[in-house]
Amino acid sequence: YINYKNMSNQHTLLMSNLLPVGSNISTWWNFGSMLLICLMLQTLTGFFLAIHYTANINLAFSSVVHITRDVPYGWTMQNLHAISASLFFICIYIHIARGLYYGLYMNKEVWLSGVTLLFTLMATAFFGYVLPWGQMSFWAATVITNLLTAIPYLGTMLTTWLWGGFSXNDPTLTRFFALHFILPFIIISLSSAHIMLLHAEGSNNPLGTNSDID
């Protein structure tokens, strides 16, 4: 049964009884759920892309072209993976901004797990950006990994170890693909921990009132 009284003062979803939460939660609390949808979409499309991708510097770009041109609905998978990656970051930055604005960093365990999630996501995105091994991919792999050389004493050794040689080459692409494949599963694990830690104490809300106010 829908109560049509004072409709203008009620959230659209609450009005339709579709969102079983208190009235003190606003739209800004929706981005965590959107991030989970992005994560599921990225994992699924990434799996189908990985089936057809070849982690070799001579074949990587051709394999991406093959996916978009020859694989049935490959262009859909590739575009969904690329576009929802951008959407992922849009949602996470809004999610973080909401947390900063409402002081949710006071819940330290949830906040620190979220920060770890952000860093892991950024690493995953970087490794994925390199995979097509086009001109910009090669440039990104060279420039970003070269930042490690700024570390005193250990920098050059770490960079050589990461590259698998003395320049960004085939071993670099192979390990970047392996890292890009495994990191989403770490993100899923961290997301589970993030959600469990959140539900241990509950979230804050715009009014700062008791979440069971209704």
UniProtKB/Swiss-Prot annotation:
Its cofactor is heme b. The cytochrome bc1 complex contains 3 respiratory subunits (MT-CYB, CYC1 and UQCRFS1), 2 core proteins (UQCRC1 and UQCRC2) and probably 6 low-molecular weight proteins. This is Cytochrome b. Heme b b562 binds at residues 81, 180. Binds 2 heme b groups non-covalently. One of its GO terms (biological process) is mitochondrial electron transport, ubiquinol to cytochrome c. The lineage of its organism: Eukaryota, Metazoa, Chordata, Craniata, Vertebrata. It is found in: Mitochondrion inner membrane. Belongs to the cytochrome b family. A ubiquinone binds at residue 199. The chain crosses the membrane at residues 31-51, 75-96, 111-131, 176-196. It comes from the Eukaryota.
